[in-house]
Amino acid sequence: MRSSERGCAPVSMCGALISRSEPYILSMTLVMMTSLAMARERERGTLESLLATPVRPLEVMIGKLAPYVGVGVVQVTLFLVMARLLFDVPMAGGWDALVVGVMLFIVGSLALGFFLSTLAQTQMQAMQMSIFYILPSMLLSGFLFPFRGMPDWAQALGSLIPVTHFLRIVRGALLKGVGLADAWPSVMALAAFVVVVTALAIVRYRTTLD
């Protein structure tokens, strides 16, 4: 049975909607989940116990975020399987670009959540900061409105948001079969975001420990 017979017609519209939804849902869950988890540890005082250990900030960050990388991979896999089986979304290819984009986006989202947790003193503050990031991502990334139809200043701000570039990778890979070579600008933008946010998170976490 085609997806148009299941309440999502036409198929191309359904595929476009689902491909736009994945980056936003993934960002929302990973950023908020990480920031809340780390803020909860701060409230409980478990982070202070790391002061007595020789573990470096980068090692702490990797240890804390590694399990959530697996959560993100499982989430993306389930999303793609459901999109194909339930809505018959076409999978045009471009798997190399999709895999690289997914991993960069997951790591970047988790690093951002970690960074926000170093700024927050409570779980409530962590949640508010996460929402403050998520809402502009929804409005400026092309999720709700066509990116090229937005004003120049909105496009400039949207280009700084990782969801924008991940959305292009997912949409291009699933609907058009765009490979890694053609998706290189968006991949490099995500990689730059990962490097910058990870560095900020490490510096901020080191300052917190000091």
Descriptions of predicted regions:
Residues M1-L78, M82-L98, L119, Q125-Q128, ...:
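Transmembrane helix-boundary elements of multi-pass transport/secretion proteins
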Residues L17, V76, L135, H165-I169:
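Generic alpha-helical secondary structure signal
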Residues E48-A52, Q121, Q155, S159, ...:
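Short amphipathic alpha-helical coupling elements at transmembrane boundaries
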Residues V74, L78, L104, F132, ...:
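Alpha-helical transmembrane segments of compact multi-pass small-molecule transporters, enriched
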Residues L98-A120, M138-S141, A192-A199:
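Hydrophobic alpha-helical transmembrane segments of polytopic membrane proteins
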Residues A120-T164:
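Transmembrane helix segments
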Residues T164-V178:
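Short, membrane-exposed interhelical loops at transmembrane-helix boundaries
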